[in-house]
Amino acid sequence: MCKCLYCYKPLGEGEIDYHKRCARKIFESGTAPTLPYTRDNIKELAREIVSASTTVTGVQAKLSLDIARGSAGEPQRFTIVGLWGRYILKPQTDRFANLPENEDLTMHMAEAAGIKTVPHSLIRFADGELCYITRRVDRTKSGGKIAMEDMCQLSERLTEDKYKGSYERIAKLIRQYSSAPLLDIVNFWEVIVFSWLTGNADMHLKNFSLYCPANEYLLTPTYDLLSTAIAMPEDDEELALTLNGKKKRIDRLDFEKAMRDSGMDDKAISKLFQRFAKAIPEWHLLISQSFLPKQLHDEYHTMIDSTSKRLLES
């Protein structure tokens, strides 16, 4: 059975890789542009862009793309551009298997819990290999730049210090700089709880940003979500930054204390946990429908059962 690379649902007769409605959501066109590269011939281009790092997201090639409009009768295609591209492509890596499938699935799981994410999908290289693609929210349709600053910048830390700090500190920065601080603080803690539930220990300072799409600074839609516990099972840390002074052996009381300290009341905190509890069945369905290999399906199911029991049933 052929499935849509965007929504994981079965394709209809004559459809290739995407439903038309799904292609429009990510590519703003009913037909997906072609991606005329393979992993082998893109490696040299990737080396020019990727900075050396030992983190999962750091070792992923992040290539800036835009859509080249073909002449009459020719299909649109993606081309690698400079920093001003409207799309970011993450190919497979040699070190960690199935990161594109992992990230796309985890982003869908966030959406199922009511978390707003950047537009994203899987896409194929010319040889059929799957990649992850996302459309940037800090670019206009014409390629112009929308002001955006991550928490490294707002906390005046260097990029290499992105793992230094706490989630409580990010909440304070959101309260200080957001035009809608109460809403954005709730949205922020939703992402932190979701990341813990899905085994994501890589949500560092650069993975949270404020942007200004319409004369107000707001928390951006969520990006860079993936399960590092599935990709790197040897890592025993549960979070990238500290929560209540620690990165592992986290429990519900740690989250509740941090949320209260940032201004959330008990009713809002309770609703947040209830929302995730309701999303668990949909998460299991998405995992089963995803493009991850069957073995990783099983590992993800098992992890969600474990983390949800620890956090949502206490």
How should each PLM-predicted stretch be described?
Residues 126-127, 131-197, 241-245, 257, ...:
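ATP-dependent phospho-/nucleotidyl transfer catalytic cores
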Residues 244-305:
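Mobile late-domain/C-terminal helix-loop "cap" segments
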Residues 95-112, 161, 166-230:
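Conserved kinase catalytic-core segment
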Residues 1-43, 47-50, 176, 217, ...:
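Regulatory N- and C-terminal appendages and interdomain linkers associated
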